Amino acid sequence: MMIMKEFTHTDEKGVRMVDVGSKPVVRRTATAEGHILLREDTINLIREKKIEKGNVLATAQIAAIVAVKRTWEIIPLCHPLPLTGVDVEFDLDDDRITARVTVRCDGKTGVEMEAVTGVSVALLTIWDMVKSVEKDDDGQYPETAISNIRVIKKEKLEL
């Protein structure tokens, strides 16, 4: 049997941002990952740094970091957080790139949404940079897909 939890952001008065003022500052870490499916030829062009728009993975790293820092501006009920670090990594396989983003902060609320936002924007940036080589003759993207974006690890450590 599933136990229903109450939402912290809504009540009979409407939507609100949760007050975390009385919570202790805790060292928080979250890691998220996701995949983008691409043609093998596209992956090889990325590896060889031959994509016309520039270095795909370096650009996606920068985009992910910017997205993490601005998550509170994009997602309405997220708090601005005192981030202490962001790591962005990529694994390239024959048909996909896996993006992994780890976010750290010493704060009163978690960094999961920041990690998920970073992964999402990294993958969207990759797609944007390879559009010209991923399109088919009709201008469609039959093989390109973003999938499996999820939090794979979350930690809280008392200071």
Curated annotation (Swiss-Prot):
GO terms for biological process: Mo-molybdopterin cofactor biosynthetic process. The keyword Membrane does not apply. It comes from the Archaea. SUPFAM superfamilies: Molybdenum cofactor biosynthesis protein C, MoaC. The active site is at residue 128. Pathway: Cofactor biosynthesis; molybdopterin biosynthesis. One of its GO terms (molecular function) is GTP 3',8'-cyclase activity. Signal peptide: none annotated. InterPro entries: Mo_CF_biosynth-C_arc, MoaC, MoaC_sf, MoCo_biosynth_MoaA/MoaC, Mopterin_CF_biosynth-C_dom. The keyword Phosphoprotein does not apply. Keywords: Molybdenum cofactor biosynthesis. HAMAP family: MoaC_A. Together with MoaA, is involved in the conversion of 5'-GTP to cyclic pyranopterin monophosphate (cPMP or molybdopterin precursor Z). Belongs to the MoaC family. This is Probable cyclic pyranopterin monophosphate synthase accessory protein. The gene is moaC.
